[in-house]
Swiss-Prot record:
Entry keywords, A to Z: 4Fe-4S, Cell inner membrane, Cell membrane, Iron, Iron-sulfur, Membrane, Metal-binding, NAD, Quinone, Translocase, Transport, Ubiquinone
One GO molecular-function entry: iron ion binding
Protein name, entry field: NADH-quinone oxidoreductase subunit B
Function: NDH-1 shuttles electrons from NADH, via FMN and iron-sulfur (Fe-S) centers, to quinones in the respiratory chain. Couples the redox reaction to proton translocation (for every two electrons transferred, four hydrogen ions are translocated across the cytoplasmic membrane), and thus conserves the redox energy in a proton gradient.
Alphabetical list of PANTHER family matching this protein: NADH DEHYDROGENASE, NADH DEHYDROGENASE [UBIQUINONE] IRON-SULFUR PROTEIN 7, MITOCHONDRIAL
One of the GO BP terms on file: electron transport coupled proton transport
Species in which this protein is naturally found: Azorhizobium caulinodans (strain ATCC 43989 / DSM 5975 / JCM 20966 / LMG 6465 / NBRC 14845 / NCIMB 13405 / ORS 571)
Length: 192
């Protein structure tokens, strides 16, 4: 019998996600990856629902548009720069509300600007999310008692994540983005 005749014609069953340098399963101590590795080793493929797949894709490709009204917009620009690079988390800027999933309201919202904010929000496709950034957007901030200031953008549009601070740091906004992704993963698409 030749050596080639003793080899099976079918490849071996996969053993999960294997690190080629060590030969061990990747993150074998993580419960999430243990479940994935066990399913891969058992069946050779993964089974999921379409809703889980859509939620996974949505959290990894959030397109945001700015509604920068004051000094918080500077920190919002900072989060896109190389030091923080929010795009590595799948959070990329867009100029048009029709291409955006997330609106970041940063700064003091006045009564005259409120209809414009609502109009831009209505142009965004569903599902749409709003991050309120800074004390002025959250509750009026320093100008809370002014006759011309809306006391929080949540009186005009529904807000999903509040980022506190005056102005909040870029790290705080980045944390707010990660919280939004966690919220999307938790709630899915149907409940929203």
């Amino acid at each position: 019998m030749t050596p080639s005749a003793t080899k099976p014609l079918v490849s071996e069953a996969p053993k999960g996600i294997i690190d080629p340098s060590t030969g061990r399963p990747i993150l074998s101590d993580d419960p999430f990856y243990k479940e994935i590795n066990a399913e891969l080793a058992d069946k050779g493929f993964l089974v999921t629902t379409v809703d889980d797949l859509i939620t996974w894709a949505r959290t990894g490709s959030l397109m945001w548009m700015t509604f920068g009204l004051a000094c918080c917009a500077v920190e919002m620009m900072q989060v896109s720069m190389p030091r923080y690079d929010v795009e590595r988390f799948g959070f990329a800027p867009r100029a048009s509300p029709r291409q955006s999933d997330v609106m970041i309201v940063a700064g003091t919202l006045t009564n005259k600007m409120a209809p414009a904010l609502r109009k831009v929000y209505d142009q965004m496709p569903e599902p749409r999310y709003v991050i309120s950034m800074g004390s002025c957007a959250n509750g009026g901030g320093y100008y809370h008692y002014s006759y011309a200031v809306v006391r929080g953008c949540d009186r005009v549009v529904p807000v999903d994540i509040y980022v506190p601070g005056c102005p909040p740091t870029a790290e705080a906004l980045l944390y707010g983005v990660l919280l939004l992704q966690r919220k999307i993963r938790r709630t899915g698409t149907i409940e929203r």
